[in-house]
Amino acid sequence: MLGRVRPLLEELVAQRRALREHQDRLAEFQARARGNGGVARGPEVVAAKQAVDRLTAQIRQGIQEIQALGCVLKDLDMGLVDFPALRDGQEIYLCYRLGEERIAFWHGVDEGYAGRKPLEADQA
């Protein structure tokens, strides 16, 4: 499953970064225009707005793809995804953060990232 989720997550993180860059650029255009008593216009503004719209749609699509796999995207900035699982008959989340080699942590459904425990501890 991680083999399918990881590339989606990598793409989402890159798209989120690009979205923020375009949003910042658009905000700069708008601030300059307001400072001059006008409205932001022109091809650069149109291109930035189109990029924001396109990236927003792509991010939504990527999130839906991750959810369709049964995973829960917890934090896009961290690249954090939970995989529902059972441990001793209890519902838990297997927890993965982008950049980790494999799924090596878990936490209870009422716990978050701070409550992660190593899977190896269960095998000792």
Predicted stretch roles:
Residues 1, 8, 34, 41, ...:
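Generic structural signal for short, flexible, solvent-exposed coil/loop and linker residues
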Residues 22-56:
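Structured domain cores in non-transmembrane regions
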Residues 53, 60-124:
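Glycine-rich, aromatic-bearing surface loops/beta-hairpins
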Residues 16, 33, 69-73:
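Short secondary-structure junctions and interdomain/linker hinges
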Residues 1-32:
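Long, hydrophobic N-terminal alpha-helical segment
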Residues 9, 16, 56-59, 63:
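A structural signal for well-ordered alpha-helices, especially hydrophobic packing surfaces
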